[in-house]
């Protein structure tokens, strides 16, 4: 099961690499949305190095999911895209497993 989940996550991450979503240049610690557009086309998980999830809040009304690709580009992912939702679900499950692990 973990192998399949990893493969799906990797597949999703690579698809993020091909994304057309862009992030705003981060200027200090400004309280505003970081994504000016989002990408919904699939990115293969092998192309994704990291994924950052920012919940909505006073800084931005949108949930923002920013994937850092292996080439260093940052891509804003569409949180409503089914493949992006799978990535988020996998990350949350992994975080839950890590938090349940004994010290």
Curated annotation (Swiss-Prot):
It comes from the Eukaryota. Pfam families: IL8. One of its GO terms (cellular component) is extracellular space. Its main location: secreted. One of its GO terms (biological process) is antimicrobial humoral immune response mediated by antimicrobial peptide. Induction: By serum. Expressed constitutively in Rous sarcoma virus (RSV) infected cells. Keywords: Chemotaxis, Cytokine, Disulfide bond, Growth factor, Secreted, Signal. Disulfide bonds join 33-60, 35-76. Residues 1-16 form the signal peptide. Transmembrane segments: none annotated. It is found in: Secreted. One of its GO terms (molecular function) is CXCR chemokine receptor binding. May be an autocrine factor that promotes the growth of fibroblasts and is involved in the neoplastic transformation of fibroblasts by v-Src. Chemotactic for peripheral blood mononuclear cells as well as for heterophils. PANTHER family: PLATELET BASIC PROTEIN, SMALL INDUCIBLE CYTOKINE A. Belongs to the intercrine alpha (chemokine CxC) family. This is Interleukin-8. The lineage of its organism: Eukaryota, Metazoa, Chordata, Craniata, Vertebrata. The gene is CXCL8.
